[in-house]
């Protein structure tokens, strides 16, 4: 079954990356043949392969075809510039690199290519005889050639030695002899430090460097200038051979090619993901990652693994995404998303500590409201889980008895600690809160005692002792009206649950609260002073401002017997009693 142009192109990209340029040319040729429409990128890629093989004429033909198909694509002119540079046509190379920069000022390869053209032009101007004068002016020339294993046998020919000595006077003469005596080519290469077995002689017209990610250690070594002990080589080191350190031409396998292809695979993966066909989605995300190293594809793959319930696999994928992202200096927002998804996976696994750890890492990279909310919820879950794991009724009873012992000894601080332990061990037992409230009250911590009583009442609304302790604390902080309300509730609950067994204690507290509520500041207080003091009480002020009560009080002034009739109403009775306690209504003495 024949492959598509895109499939051939992907295989060609892989072959190019592996430095198998002949194979890459074959695959790009097939891609060109099956492509429904002329594709400038395919010609550009094949041109890059030819350039890497130093087949500059073929590279030039493909580059011309590339710009013919798409004359507005700046990288096509990179290809033309590279081919012309390889052929030694510096003017055309310069012209095409400049054209590339006109179309795209950020074209890095064009800038590097143009710089190389300028360096080569300067070298030619500095040494119009290509450095031959310096090469043959070396007084140790013959001796060095005799010592070199590549040329030692040649130096046994006296006629050849005589020729070399003659070139000292006339170095241009070698141009005629090169075509008739191939030994001279070897000698020239040796003097210039060129290994004819390794590189084509045209390598001096080389291409811009390939991206670091596509270089191997061996290629870097091969690209370095060859070392030699001969003085003649040192003298010629300033010649254009310096440019031989350049490597093969980069191909368009990044944003304009591999990224586009990878995004297509990602889009296909997204379709399968939405259809909940996660295995197929993962397959496409893997292809996207193979085509272009963007950790977004790994994040997507992890999302599919997560939906499959393969949480540990997803965590492994996301850790790889973070590691790769660090190396590639990926956007911190993308890395933040990787950390967040690791947190999600750990949450599914029930590891709340790891969940919190990775949500925090995510927020360190990039703070978002969503992850912050998840972090807060996870922290609450962990706190709740730890509290639930701590529950132990037997330990709670031990703590209660310990607290009781401390309370009996008047060791209030340790009593509070013991009852706190009881609450942790049995958070639903109202007695722990009520007992701690009693100890806190002894320490004069009345607001905290009231809070504990409220918690005890919340846990057990029929716990009369909690109401009584709450009212006692409220009286201590002079919240008399609130204390009376609490005691009313206590009286009701006591009657319902305990048959009024605590009625006497409740009545005593009620009387105490009522008396202290409106207790005069001095024994010689005038009625006006009593009225002003009483009106500071919110309940008294509300009663006096009630239109119904105002009417009743006016009637009572004219007919005291009418007041007795109104007091048959429980609500009115309560309000009248409050006004009597406040000193607003004075009874006979």
Swiss-Prot record:
Residues 226-239 have a biased composition (Polar residues). GO terms for biological process: protein folding; protein localization; protein targeting to mitochondrion. Pfam families: STI1-HOP_DP, TPR_1, TPR_16, TPR_8. InterPro entries: STI1/HOP_DP, STI1_HS-bd, TPR-like_helical_dom_sf, TPR_rpt. One of its GO terms (cellular component) is cytoplasm. Disulfide bonds: none annotated. There is a cross-link at residues 99, 168, 384 (Glycyl lysine isopeptide (Lys-Gly) (interchain with G-Cter in ubiquitin)). Induction: By heat shock and canavanine. Residues 199-265 are annotated as: Disordered. Residues 138-177, 537-576 form the STI1 domain. It is found in: Cytoplasm. The keyword Iron-sulfur does not apply. May play a role in mediating the heat shock response of some HSP70 genes. It is required for optimal growth of yeast cells at both low and high temperature. Present with 67600 molecules/cell in log phase SD medium. This is Heat shock protein STI1. It comes from Saccharomyces cerevisiae (strain ATCC 204508 / S288c) (Baker's yeast). The gene is STI1.
